[in-house]
């Protein structure tokens, strides 16, 4: 595998491309701007093409494309921002045009054309002589009443003044450059004076300061004024205005250093001492000039020449040297001349030095032209504005030594040319004047750019204020953590027996409490006593017919030995016969086998289990092994464990206490067997729960039994009967349902119908809970083999049928 520092290095030339290809989300804007796509592609193609596979080149191409797309996005965003800014600026200009003062029609012919390249040397700055300042408005119409002073400082060039001065400077540059070796001697004869006039036009959007020089000699001011006037009327004639004395001044080059020191000294003195007095002096001079013009043309020209003369020590070449002083305002010396200060000049501005001309002719032309022009002069920081009927440009003899110093320099870049004049041009509204391509506008203006908008406020996240009242102290928190008392719950005392439950039910149902025994649990000796069968001897056949009738009645009544608690014996039975009364405890806990006579033995097997002792059933052995009968004397009680023959009129009494007639027998303690009122009328259970129902069909016959009673009552099993449930297979509800089905099958057999019961008919009209119980008991019986379940089709009716052969449920 190859290794290339150009590709692998993060800071290499292709580092940003790899980042864009693999981790585009981590690409930064600085990386996008710093990536040069052509050079990156050249490096990939020229240096690493042979060593790279197409797969690597594909990723490099992907990175290049992504960087290029990001560059396009950045450019698109910048263009949108610029377009939005231009639209907002144009909208503001339109609103200002609607609300501002309308301009006269004469101003529409002037506009600004912006060439592709600003070549100031090629500009043709001509002067329109037929334009007489028709765009000048009164000061009140163009000035806001509550406007600030900064707005007043922005003035506009006058058309004639700007063009005249530019041509004058350009002409002097040409003449001075050709004859720079001839003039230098008379540089100390005159001093410099800088004069600036700030003329405001209707838009009041820019200001330009013009630097002018005035001579010291009192003999030459008339000649300089004449040259200035000629320049306003005919700028092209400046090419032939050349002073013959300049050839001698230029020759003295060795005095260059002395001139510079003198100029610096004069500038420093003027700035320190005459900065504050210029406003009043200029105002006095201007007022004096206006009064002199009203007298006569000639007198006004002479006063203008005389007022603008300065002594030699007041020359100010500070603007020529590019010294940057007060941003606005002017200074005057001795109440005669004002010396304005330029904002920023990197190159000196030469002033044409002309000889004496026809003064009267130049002054008249200058006055005729300026009578129609209204100019506003900005005085000292732009705070004082006055209207003047005339505006003049006074050009006097300049410091020849300084001019020679400026032109003697061998550095060609230091020579003055038209490009050194700082002129700011800003596009405004589109011009109505159609100018051909490459042409220039006769007017240049400084248009203030729109004020910078306030940047959007950076959103800061709010500090989260903490509520001291909600804070939980550390001490409380420690106590809550260490204390686990609230997590512990007291355990409820669970009773070991069901006595509290029985007591609660007893008070809830007081009518049933009379049927329950006072002693809930019996003795184990009594329970074992009743487990043995009772055998009764049949009456003698040799008795009277009445005795025979009584014997048959005993045989019949032996089947109903177990009585319900509410059954009361009749008087005939108590007189004629003696029955063996059995307590409910014996009926529930033991199996009875009663023998009547020597041959006929009717056994009634009672299936019950011991609830406390847990003894096994002994009824099956007792039924299979008969006891040998013995003869008992009259009036002798017979034990239940022996089979005896009882003499007539001798009652057979068991070991239990005989109950008198019409005495109700208490309910059995077995809650499971006698749990509902319906069980009081049923017969005893079989001795064994596994006995087939076909062996003793009459035992399961229930009179007036309803299936609703079976299903409505909840089955309750106490703690004493849990052992019986483990030994037995069927619950009481299962037995009751089996009895109900047995009864139904017997009735169908008697009617000679098919022994079949529909489960849908049994569940019809019952609740969901009862239907579920019935279905469950049906499944239990089906599992034990008592019934047979049949369903012909899915989701169809289920039929319960009796099994064809006897089976023991196991």
UniProtKB/Swiss-Prot annotation:
Region Disordered: start-end pairs: 200-244, 273-315, 606-626
UniProt entry tagged with the keyword Membrane: no
Organism superkingdom: Eukaryota
Biased composition, class Basic and acidic residues, residue ranges: 220-234, 273-310
Gene3D superfamilies linked: Structural maintenance of chromosome 1. Chain E
Main localization (coarse): nucleus
Annotated function: May be involved in sister chromatid cohesion during mitosis.
Protein's UniProt name: Sister chromatid cohesion 1 protein 2
Natural source organism: Arabidopsis thaliana
């Amino acid at each position: 595998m190859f290794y290339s520092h150009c590709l692998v290095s993060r800071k290499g030339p292709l580092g940003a491309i790899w980042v864009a290809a693999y981790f585009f989300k981590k690409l930064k804007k600085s990386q996008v701007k710093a990536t040069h796509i052509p050079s990156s592609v050249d490096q990939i193609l020229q240096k690493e093409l042979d060593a790279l596979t197409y797969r690597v080149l594909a990723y490099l191409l992907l990175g290049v494309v992504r960087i290029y797309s990001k560059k396009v996005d950045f450019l698109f965003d910048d263009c949108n921002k610029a377009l939005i800014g231009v639209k907002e600026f144009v909208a503001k200009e339109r609103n200002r045009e609607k609300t501002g003062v309308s301009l006269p029609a004469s101003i529409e012919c002037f506009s600004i054309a912006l060439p592709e390249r600003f070549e100031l040397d090629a500009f043709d700055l001509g002067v329109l002589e037929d334009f007489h300042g028709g765009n000048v408005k009164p000061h009140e119409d163009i000035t806001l009443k509550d406007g600030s002073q900064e707005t007043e400082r922005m003035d506009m060039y006058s058309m004639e003044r700007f063009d005249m001065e530019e041509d004058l400077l350009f002409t002097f540059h040409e003449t001075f450059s050709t004859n720079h070796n001839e003039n230098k001697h008379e540089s100390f004869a005159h001093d410099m004076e800088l004069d600036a006039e700030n003329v405001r036009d209707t838009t009041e959007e820019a200001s330009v300061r013009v630097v002018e020089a005035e001579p010291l000699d009192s003999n030459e001011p008339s000649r300089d004024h004449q040259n200035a006037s000629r320049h306003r009327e005919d700028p092209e004639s400046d090419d032939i205005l050349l002073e013959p004395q300049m050839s001698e001044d230029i020759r003295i080059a060795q005095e260059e250093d002395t001139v510079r020191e003198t100029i610096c000294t004069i500038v420093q003195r003027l700035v320190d001492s005459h900065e504050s007095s210029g406003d009043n002096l200029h105002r006095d001079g201007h007022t004096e000039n206006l009064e002199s013009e009203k007298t006569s043309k000639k007198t006004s020209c002479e006063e203008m020449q005389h007022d603008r003369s300065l002594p030699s020590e007041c020359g100010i070449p500070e603007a020529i040297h590019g010294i940057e002083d007060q941003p606005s305002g002017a200074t005057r010396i001795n109440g005669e001349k004002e010396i304005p200060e330029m904002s920023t000049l990197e190159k000196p501005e030469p002033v044409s030095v002309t000889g004496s001309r026809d003064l009267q002719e130049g002054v008249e032309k200058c006055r005729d032209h300026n009578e129609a022009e209204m100019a506003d002069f900005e005085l000292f920081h732009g705070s004082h504005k006055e209207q003047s009927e005339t505006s003049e440009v006074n050009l006097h003899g300049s410091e020849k030594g300084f001019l020679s110093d400026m032109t003697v320099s061998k550095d060609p870049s230091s020579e003055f040319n038209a490009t050194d004049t700082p002129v700011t041009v800003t596009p405004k509204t589109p011009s109505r004047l159609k100018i051909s391509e490459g042409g220039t506008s006769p007017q240049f203006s400084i248009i203030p750019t729109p004020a910078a908008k306030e940047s959007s406020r950076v959103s800061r996240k709010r500090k989260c204020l903490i509520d001291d009242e909600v804070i939980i102290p550390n001490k409380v928190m420690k106590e809550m953590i260490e204390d686990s008392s609230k997590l512990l719950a007291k355990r409820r005392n669970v009773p070991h027996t069901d006595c509290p439950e029985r007591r609660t039910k007893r008070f809830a149902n007081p009518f049933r409490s009379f049927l329950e025994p006072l002693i809930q649990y019996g003795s184990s000796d009594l329970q074992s006593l009743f487990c043995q069968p009772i055998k009764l001897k049949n009456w003698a056949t040799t008795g009277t017919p009445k005795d025979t009738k009584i014997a048959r009645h005993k045989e019949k009544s032996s089947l109903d030995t177990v009585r319900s608690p509410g059954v009361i014996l009749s008087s005939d039975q108590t007189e004629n016969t003696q029955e063996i009364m059995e307590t409910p405890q014996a009926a529930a806990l033991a199996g009875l086998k009663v023998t009547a006579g020597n041959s006929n033995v009717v056994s009634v097997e009672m299936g019950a289990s011991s609830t406390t002792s847990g003894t096994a059933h002994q009824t099956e052995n007792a039924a299979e092994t008969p006891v040998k009968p013995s003869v008992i004397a009259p009036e002798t009680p017979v034990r239940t464990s022996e089979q005896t023959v009882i003499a007539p009129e001798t009652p057979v009494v068991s070991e239990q206490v005989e109950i008198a007639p019409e005495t109700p027998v208490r309910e059995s303690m077995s809650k499971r067997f006698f749990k509902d009122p319906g069980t009081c009328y049923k017969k005893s259970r079989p001795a064994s729960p596994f006995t087939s129902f076909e062996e003793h069909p009459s035992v399961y016959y229930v009179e007036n039994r309803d299936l609703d009673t079976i299903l409505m009552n909840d089955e309750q099993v106490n703690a004493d009967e849990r052992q019986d449930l483990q030994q037995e297979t069927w619950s009481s509800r299962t037995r009751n349902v089996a009895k109900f089905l047995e009864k139904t099958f017997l009735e169908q057999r008697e009617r000679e119908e098919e022994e079949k019961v529909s489960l849908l008919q049994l569940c019809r009209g019952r609740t969901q809970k009862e239907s579920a119980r019935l279905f469950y008991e049906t499944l239990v019986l089906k599992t034990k083999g008592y019934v047979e379940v049949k369903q012909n089709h899915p989701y169809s009716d289920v039929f319960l049928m009796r099994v064809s052969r006897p089976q023991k449920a196991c």
